[in-house]
Structures are given as C-alpha cells and as structure tokens.
C-alpha cells in the first residue's frame, strides 16, 4: 500500500476540501482516465483495491498511472477510550481528492476494455467518478 517514506509531522489536522482541482484535471499520460466528480478523502486501501481491479481486468496489458497519492495521516483512538488524553496515533493514510481530479489513467488497451476496467475501479472508490478519454488531435 502507498504511504510516504518520511513526513515532516507525524499527525495532521483534518482540514476541509474546498473548490475544484486546478492541477491534475486533464489527462497527462494515458489515453483514458477516471475523473473524480465530488470531493472526498480516498484511503490507500481504496486506491490499491481500484488498482488491482484495473490491472486484473486489463489482464496486465497496457499501462496504468495512479495520479493521486495518500500523503495525509488520519489518526484514530482505540475502541472504548475516554475523551481527552491527546490525539490518537496515525491509523491510515488518505489522499484529498477534489472534484475534477484525474485519479487513474490507462493506455495500450481498447476503448471498451478501458471503459469496463475503469468502471470496475470506480466501484472500489467512495466517490462519484466519470470516464474520460483523450480527444484525438
């Protein structure tokens, strides 16, 4: 699973996701992509599950690019622990995803296989997504 090798701080504030994606909103590498339509936090496990669904359906043909990285630690207190006594320890890593962000890109497969594979990957994610393809120049 994906997580940073080293971070400046062990714990992070929750924060909010405002606005739409300005960077990473267009296809940069592949021919087809999966674009986020709503804001949310996507965990490293969800990204990995989507990647596995993609590669399995493509039968390891073509190439996959993951355009989001879980760089935000989410802390959690153990079960049945009273309030107070500090913030919990980091439990998982998430990526903040804004609407319009291209999350996955694929290339080297047909339109039909790409659409099916990205639809399977979208089922593993907690947000609404849209299939996008590069317009032929």
Swiss-Prot record:
<comment type="function">
    <text>Binds 23S rRNA and is also seen to make contacts with the A and possibly P site tRNAs.</text>
</comment>
<protein>
    <recommendedName>
        <fullName>Large ribosomal subunit protein uL16</fullName>
    </recommendedName>
</protein>
<keyword id="KW-0699">rRNA-binding</keyword>
<dbReference type="GO" id="GO:0019843">
    <property type="term" value="F:rRNA binding"/>
</dbReference>
<keyword id="KW-0689">Ribosomal protein</keyword>
<dbReference type="InterPro" id="IPR020798">
    <property type="entry name" value="Ribosomal_uL16_CS"/>
</dbReference>
<keyword id="KW-0694">RNA-binding</keyword>
<dbReference type="GO" id="GO:0022625">
    <property type="term" value="C:cytosolic large ribosomal subunit"/>
</dbReference>
<dbReference type="GO" id="GO:0003735">
    <property type="term" value="F:structural constituent of ribosome"/>
</dbReference>
<dbReference type="GO" id="GO:0006412">
    <property type="term" value="P:translation"/>
</dbReference>
<dbReference type="GO" id="GO:0000049">
    <property type="term" value="F:tRNA binding"/>
</dbReference>
<dbReference type="InterPro" id="IPR047873">
    <property type="entry name" value="Ribosomal_uL16"/>
</dbReference>
<comment type="subunit">
    <text>Part of the 50S ribosomal subunit.</text>
</comment>
<keyword id="KW-0820">tRNA-binding</keyword>
<comment type="similarity">
    <text>Belongs to the universal ribosomal protein uL16 family.</text>
</comment>
<dbReference type="InterPro" id="IPR016180">
    <property type="entry name" value="Ribosomal_uL16_dom"/>
</dbReference>
<keyword id="KW-0687">Ribonucleoprotein</keyword>
<dbReference type="InterPro" id="IPR036920">
    <property type="entry name" value="Ribosomal_uL16_sf"/>
</dbReference>
<dbReference type="InterPro" id="IPR000114">
    <property type="entry name" value="Ribosomal_uL16_bact-type"/>
</dbReference>
<dbReference type="Pfam" id="PF00252">
    <property type="entry name" value="Ribosomal_L16"/>
</dbReference>
